[in-house]
Design a protein with these regions (language model features):
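Structured secondary-structure scaffolds
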Residues: 1-34, 86-90, 134, 141-280
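N-terminal, positively charged nucleic-acid-binding surface of large information/translation enzymes
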Residues: 1-167
Length: 280
């Protein structure tokens, strides 16, 4: 989060807490992972506005998050911060592997960027010139960047959805993802030169990793993939469930599975995209 938590954050976490408690009661060995996504332009800019460093800014947010989960008696098993050294080590290894095998390449990004959503968009994807996800203004972006070959995995993703009908739930969300892919899946811009608050690309440090490549990798870095902090990857991966808000379902059901396919790693068994709590 880039600011104080809202009720939507609690919605996701309480739902996961209920599931974790139920599974423990059934005798399962549970890994309930939560944490904070701390990099990106949004946080860099908010820290500058507050007159503090990005790390000082996120440290304050993390303290409030942990206080809230304690108040709500959230029974998480592990809390990961994407600024943790072991996580950054894992991300750099993942990025390097994808680059060395040809799934990441250098190019030039020309398009639009939504800072609140941390999303890249083409002209044809905008709705009335605005972000199709949140409806906010986007700004033009033009910079050298690395790209992940997401489009290479379009057919495999569609096959995944067809052969595993429970992979994306509810059904309506799955249909949205299928439509998104069928309109033409573009490669994903996975680095920035204009954003300094991020994990450096190890072989080209003027670039920082796109926040979503960094954030999604937490699911396996928190288990010890690509680092020596933990040794539970083989025990707890693949995950039985990712529980996410509908606004970030696309990253979890398109970009993340494509990355895992490229890494030749197992996919999570299910991704549930819940709706929003709205106050009119």
């Amino acid at each position: 989060p880039s600011d104080k938590l809202h009720i939507g954050h609690s919605y996701t976490t309480v739902a996961c807490d209920a599931l974790a408690r139920f599974k423990r009661m059934q005798g399962y060995d549970v890994m309930f992972l939560t944490g904070t996504d701390e990099h990106g332009q949004k946080i860099q800019d908010k820290a500058a506005d507050a007159g503090v460093t990005p790390k000082e800014y996120v440290d304050k947010i993390v303290a409030t998050v942990k206080d809230l989960w304690k108040l709500m008696d959230i029974s998480y098993d592990r809390f990961i911060r994407t600024t943790d050294d072991y996580h950054m080590e894992s991300c750099q290894k993942i990025f390097t592997k994808l680059y060395e095998q040809g799934d990441i390449y250098k190019g030039e990004y020309i398009g639009h960027y939504c800072k609140p959503c941390e999303s890249f968009w083409t002209d044809s994807q905008l709705v009335d010139g605005k972000c199709p996800d949140c409806g906010r203004e986007v700004y033009d972006a033009h910079e050298e960047a690395y790209f992940f070959k997401t489009g290479k995995y379009a057919d495999r993703l569609l096959k995944l959805y067809e052969e595993n009908p429970q992979f994306i739930q509810p059904e309506s969300r799955k249909n949205e993802m299928i439509a998104f892919i069928k309109q033409g899946l573009q490669d994903t811009c996975v680095s920035r030169t204009s954003v300094k608050w991020g994990i450096p690309v190890p072989f080209d440090p003027k670039h920082t990793m796109y926040v979503w490549v960094d954030a999604l990798s937490n699911y396996i870095s928190a288990l010890g993939y690509g680092n020596e902090k933990y040794d539970e990857y083989s025990k707890f991966w693949p995950a039985d469930l990712h529980m996410v808000g509908k606004e970030i379902l696309r990253f979890h059901t398109i970009l993340w599975p494509a990355m895992l396919m490229a890494l030749d790693l197992p996919l999570p068994k299910r991704v549930f995209g819940h709706g929003w709590l709205l106050m009119n």
